[in-house]
Swiss-Prot record:
Phosphorylation at Ser-365 by MAPK8/JNK1 and MAPK9/JNK2 may be required for exclusive localization at tricellular tight junstions. Polyubiquitinated at Lys-638 via 'Lys-63'-linked ubiquitin chains; deubiquitinated by USP53. Residues 1-21, 414-649 are annotated as: Disordered. It is a single-pass type I membrane protein. Residues 426-444, 529-565, 589-609 have a biased composition (Basic and acidic residues). Residues 86-234 form the Ig-like V-type domain. This is Lipolysis-stimulated lipoprotein receptor. Belongs to the immunoglobulin superfamily. LISCH7 family. It comes from Homo sapiens (Human). GO terms for biological process: epithelial structure maintenance; establishment of blood-brain barrier; establishment of skin barrier; liver development; maintenance of blood-brain barrier; protein localization to tricellular tight junction; tricellular tight junction assembly. Disulfide bonds join C111-C218. Residues 1-16 have a biased composition (Gly residues). It comes from the Eukaryota.
Length: 649
């Protein structure tokens, strides 16, 4: 190492000397003058000179032998002062003081140091200090006022660096790593980073990160080397990677893309993914999920049909239904609703081609022959359009039970439990007797039969119920109060007429066949089953009877009932008509006519039964719920086209 002055007795430092003992350099060359850098040598020299001055003062005034000893001591002290231990120096250098790297790229900051001797390993310390000024900002604004001021300061002082030379209190200072021997210790801020000190004193970053830009100082500390320059610095700037193309996928490069376009592309991709999930959900949606959860791609549909689901819930929970109360729930006798309109289970319908109406399936039969199930059209009900065709049971042309199930499903689809009310529309009026197959016995339910119509008298028997003449317009006919009629009570039913038969009518009953004007026994009037038949018999003058007894029966049923609110009440009960002052006298001719007809009916019964067998079809086979259930299960297993909604029914 170079020193200020080397050699003894020289000023230019060119002379050199060696110590006497080879292992201890106690007589190393020392400078003539000290410039304040070695304080220990200066203090030793001052003490030696003080002792020398004291010895000389004593020796001059003492014995000559003592003076010789003092001279030896003086020489020894002088030589010991000149031959003290040498002062070593250290020098630290950085080969490249300026580094610019890309983010996440490795970088190494080289640092080397030199010493006169290395009896012990020195301590290497790397420190981080932020820039006093931002180099990146100044590079993008070279015409700023601060840049102009820095340029003026650099021109006046060539060694001035405005980005490095500032107080540590105004910038960030951190210890990066330290090394002593082979042990490397990272600072608290850099724990977990791949940073190490390699070689002599090189600082190595495996990956740079944001915030690594700054000034890094390399310091070497040794207990033996007290002179020289033990510190140097290097600047590091970390830049982000910028290129003219954007690499979206590995090996795929695209041109520069705007930020707003990138956001739009991301939103569209998210929407497409959501739509794809919705479509897959609709395709794979189970039929047992909640009906109120709808798919986003098909909002008009849900996982299962709502109408069918609600009807099934009503059937299983026992809630009364306005469509078929006896089918969906078992009602108590107190809440028994009026019987719905039924389709008669009789012979073929007249007036239609083939004997069937337009809304009846000819090949379907739920209870055997004579039981026809109507098929609903889409135009029959206003709510039929709401039923989705995707959830209907596809009726099979070969299987009659599928038609029945289709009809029942159509009824359930039109069922709305949230709006109870009186039944309306063809769906309610088309109720057939299929709904009563599973009902309990009618004998176990308290019910009241229809009220019988009062018996008409002979005076107004010639007028039909459609006649405008009322009871008040009929003239009162007074009858004589004698005979057996005056002593007999009024008959309240047809069956009570047997007890009121007079002696004269018993014989007339046997002669009734001859009194009918030659009418054959096959076309005798049938036995009266109700009082409506008596009206038809009395109205024979207005409506002549045909030879077909069934036509007469249907004609009596097609006659509209009398309006109870009109003033034409045909009742003979004085309690029902308060305007009459008293009861009219009873006419016995009606009684005689009824008894005569009853006797002829008893004799004509065998012939009538033979005629009825010729008109009516044979009775259907007895219904068995077990057989029907077993056959229904077999048909369901064979039909693979049934949807899962049919199981709810």
């Amino acid at each position: 190492m170079q020193q200020d002055g080397l050699g003894v007795g020289t000023r230019n430092g060119s002379g050199k000397g060696r110590s006497v003992h080879p292992s201890w350099p106690w007589c190393a060359p020392r400078p003539l003058r000290y410039f304040g850098r070695d304080a220990r040598a200066r203090r030793a020299q001052t003490a030696a000179m003080a002792l020398l001055a004291g010895g000389l003062s004593r020796g001059l005034g003492s014995h000559p032998a003592a003076a010789g000893r003092d001279a030896v001591v003086f020489v020894w002290l002088l030589l010991s002062t000149w031959c003290t231990a040498p002062a070593r120096a250290i020098q630290v250098t950085v080969s490249n003081p300026y580094h610019v790297v890309i983010l996440f790229q490795p970088v190494t900051l080289p640092c080397t140091y030199q010493m006169t001797s290395t009896p012990t390993q020195p301590i290497v310390i790397w420190k981080y200090k932020s820039f006093c000024r931002d180099r990146i900002a100044d590079a993008f604004s070279p015409a700023s006022v601060d840049n102009q001021l820095n340029a003026q300061l650099a021109a006046g002082n060539p060694g001035y660096n405005p980005y490095v030379e500032c107080q540590d209190s105004v910038r960030t200072v951190r210890v990066v790593a330290t090394k002593q021997g082979n042990a490397v210790t990272l600072g608290d801020y850099y724990q977990g980073r791949r940073i190490t000190i390699t070689g002599n004193a090189d600082l190595t970053f495996d990956q740079t990160a944001w915030g690594d830009s700054g000034v890094y100082y390399c310091s070497v500390v040794s207990a033996q080397d007290l002179q020289g320059n033990n510190e140097a610095y290097a600047e590091l700037i970390v830049l982000g990677r910028t290129s003219g193309v954007a690499e979206l996928l590995p090996g795929f490069q695209a041109g520069p893309i705007e930020d707003w376009l990138f956001v739009v592309v991301v939103c569209l991709a998210a929407f497409l993914i959501f739509l794809l999930l919705g479509i897959c959900w609709c395709q794979c949606c189970p039929h047992t999920c909640c009906c109120y959860v709808r798919c986003p791609c098909c909002p008009d549909k849900c996982c299962c049909p709502e109408a069918l689901y609600a009807a099934g819930k009503a059937a299983t929970s026992g809630v009364p239904s306005i469509y078929a109360p006896s089918t969906y729930a078992h009602l108590s006798p107190a809440k028994t609703p009026p019987p719905p309109a039924m389709i008669p289970m009789g012979p073929a319908y007249n007036g239609y081609p083939g004997g069937y109406p337009g809304d009846v399936d000819r090949s379907s039969s739920a209870g055997g022959q004579g039981s026809y199930v109507p098929l609903l059209r889409d135009t029959d009900s206003s709510v039929a359009s709401e039923v989705r065709s995707g959830y209907r049971i596809q009726a099979s042309q070969q299987d009659d039970s599928m038609r029945v199930l289709y009809y029942m499903e159509k009824e359930l689809a039109n069922f709305d439990p949230s709006r109870p009310g009186p039944p309306s529309g063809r769906v309610e009026r088309a109720m057939s007797e299929v709904t009563s197959l599973h009902e309990d016995d009618w004998r176990s339910r308290p019910s009241r039969g229809p009220a019988l119509t009062p018996i008409r008298d002979e005076e107004w028997g010639g007028h039909s119920p459609r006649s405008p003449r009322g009871w008040d317009q009929e003239p009162a006919r007074e009858q004589a109060g004698g005979g057996w009629r005056a002593r007999r009570p009024r008959a309240r039913s047809v069956d009570a007429l047997d007890d009121l038969t007079p002696p004269s009518t018993a014989e007339s009953g046997s002669r009734s066949p001859t009194s009918n004007g030659g009418r054959s026994r096959a076309y005798m009037p049938p036995r009266s089953r109700s009082r409506d038949d008596l009206y038809d018999q009395d109205d024979s003058r207005d409506f002549p009877r045909s030879r077909d007894p069934h036509y007469d029966d249907f004609r009596s049923r097609e006659r509209p009932p009398a309006d109870p609110r009109s003033h034409h009440h045909r009742t003979r009960d004085p309690r029902d008509n308060g305007s009459r002052s008293g009861d009219l006298p009873y006419d016995g001719r009606l009684l005689e006519e009824a008894v005569r007809k009853k006797g002829s009916e008893e004799r004509r019964r065998p012939h009538k039964e033979e005629e009825e067998e010729a008109y009516y079809p044979p009775a259907p086979p007895p219904y068995s719920e077990t057989d029907s259930q077993a056959s229904r299960e077999r048909r369901l297993k064979k039909n693979l086209a049934l949807s899962r909604e049919s199981l709810v029914v």
